[in-house]
């Protein structure tokens, strides 16, 4: 009788163990390798940069015509590629020349400044064919106001910002004086769009700011005092708009 009971019990035990074994993963199993994202090539990184900067231009233009958007896109991407290739060949030389220009500018001697700027202009003259072709391609798709939008985007809006600041700093500017300032700033912008860095773009604007301020001095403005008055006014305005902060409970006044 005992042997009969054991015979009945044994299949049930084996079935139980087989279920437990199936429920547990094998200790020797190997997990599948994790897929790694492919490392982008330098060309792919460059292309991503061209697309990013092109989107910035298109966002500011706010074009609605798909065909024009596509044309401006292709023009901008091609220009960024030409621009990067040119800077790869010339940036080492330009870095040294801009350093010399900075030293010359500190002397406040216009002859020294002009002499230091001359070789920089000579280097950038080699990019002029690409610059002119770029402007011609834009002119075939965009109106003059839209081209100015492109130029302002490429120079981080330095022209309108600087022009408006001059109006606040130097009171009573005549229409002729305003026209002179705007013309110089437009020349600065035209040169700065080819620059390789933010600092270099700013340097082109400084070049023409110096000329504007020399002009305003000749026009009877006290440039240094005008700047001091403007800074003092801005500080007073900021102080007036800041809320009074009361001491917290328990703090000593």
Annotate each PLM feature.
Residues 17-23:
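Sec/Tat signal peptide C-region and signal peptidase I cleavage site
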Residues 24-253:
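Charge-rich (acidic/polar
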Residues 6-7, 28:
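Short amphipathic alpha-helical "recognition" segments used for binding
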Residues 7-16:
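Bacterial N-terminal signal peptides
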Residues 1-4, 24:
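Positively charged n-region of N-terminal signal peptides that target proteins for export
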């Amino acid at each position: 009788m005992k042997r009969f009971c054991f015979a009945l019990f044994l299949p049930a035990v084996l079935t139980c163990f087989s279920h437990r074994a199936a429920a547990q993963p094998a200790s020797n199993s190997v997990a599948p390798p994790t897929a790694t994202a492919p490392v982008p090539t330098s060309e792919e990184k460059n292309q991503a940069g061209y697309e990013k900067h092109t989107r910035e231009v298109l966002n500011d233009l706010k074009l609605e015509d798909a065909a024009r958007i596509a044309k401006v896109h292709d023009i901008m991407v091609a220009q960024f590629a030409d621009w990067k290739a040119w800077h790869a060949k010339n940036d080492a030389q330009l870095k040294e020349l801009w350093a010399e220009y900075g030293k010359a500018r500190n002397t406040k001697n216009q002859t020294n400044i002009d002499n230091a700027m001359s070789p920089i202009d000579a280097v950038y003259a080699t990019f002029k064919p690409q610059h002119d072709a770029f402007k011609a391609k834009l002119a075939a798709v965009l109106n003059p106001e839209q081209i100015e939008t492109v130029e302002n985007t490429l120079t981080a809006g330095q022209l309108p910002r600087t022009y408006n600041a001059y109006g606040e700093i130097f009171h009573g500017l005549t229409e002729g004086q305003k026209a002179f300032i705007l013309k110089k700033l437009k020349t600065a912008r035209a040169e700065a769009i080819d620059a390789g860095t933010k600092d270099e773009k700013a340097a082109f604007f400084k070049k023409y700011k110096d000329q504007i301020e020399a002009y305003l001095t000749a026009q009877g403005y006290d440039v240094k005092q005008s700047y001091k008055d403007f800074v003092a006014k801005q500080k007073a305005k900021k102080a007036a708009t800041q809320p009074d902060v009361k001491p917290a409970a328990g703090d000593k006044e």
